[in-house]
């Protein structure tokens, strides 16, 4: 989360820059920004991977190993995911 150096408001990402909606300040240094957004999860699904049954919700989460955005939410409280492409288990 980044804040405007002029007025202290939250900076929003617009295209390839960050913009303050209050005073209009813009910053082109967005390569360090990680965007997260809430996604409505699909209904629970059962997935079979490598002969192992995995139950969970299909979610959009970036896998740190292969870069895929499809994952199974294994544990919501611990934010534990399993990548649907490479089966890597990670948390965010």
From Swiss-Prot:
One Pfam entry name: Zn_ribbon_RPB9
Catalytic machinery residues: 76-78
Flexible linker: annotated span: 32-56
Cofactor note (record): Binds 2 Zn(2+) ions.
GO cellular component, one term: DNA-directed RNA polymerase complex
Matching InterPro entries: DNA-dir_RNA_pol-M_15_CS (IPR019761), Zn_ribbon_RPB9 (IPR001529)
Cofactor(s) this protein requires: Zn(2+)
Stretches for region ZR-N: 1-31
Residues at which Zn(2+) 2 binds: 63, 66, 83, 86
Keywords, comma-separated and alphabetical: Antiviral defense, DNA-directed RNA polymerase, Metal-binding, Repressor, Transcription, Transcription regulation, Zinc
Upregulation: At least 4-fold induced following infection by Sulfolobus turreted icosahedral virus 1 (STIV-1) in strain 2-2-12. Undetected in non-infected cells. Induced following STIV-1 infection, protein is detectable by 12 hours post-infection (p.i.) and increases until at least 24 hours p.i. in strain 2-2-12 (at protein level).
Binding site for Zn(2+) 1: 4, 7, 20, 23
Single GO MF annotation: metal ion binding
Region described as ZR-C: spans on this chain: 55-92
Domain of life: Archaea
GO annotation terms (biological process): defense response to virus; DNA-templated transcription; negative regulation of DNA-templated transcription
Family stated for the protein in its record: Belongs to the archaeal RpoM/eukaryotic RPA12/RPB9/RPC11 RNA polymerase family.
Function statement: A potent inhibitor of RNA polymerase (RNAP) probably involved in viral defense. Destabilizes the transcription pre-initiation complex of TBP, TFB, DNA and RNAP, inhibits abortive transcription initiation, productive initiation and transcription elongation. Increases the RNAP KM for NTPs about 50-fold. Overexpression of TFS1-tip4 (TFS1 with the active tip of this protein, phenocopies this protein) in S.acidocaldarius MW001 leads to severe growth inhibition.
Quaternary structure, from the entry: Interacts with RNA polymerase.
Record text about domains: Has 2 zinc-ribbon domains (ZR-N and ZR-C); functionally important residues Lys-76, Lys-77 and Lys-78 are probably located at the tip of a domain that extends from ZR-C into the RNAP active site. The nature of these residues determines if the protein is involved in stalled transcript cleavage and thus activation (Asp and Glu residues in TFS1) or in RNAP inhibition (Lys or Arg residues in this protein TFS4). Increasing numbers of Lys residues lead to an increased ability to inhibit transcription.
Miscellaneous comment: Strain 2-2-12 is a substrain of P2 that is highly susceptible to infection by Sulfolobus turreted icosahedral virus 1 (STIV-1).
Protein name: Transcription factor S4
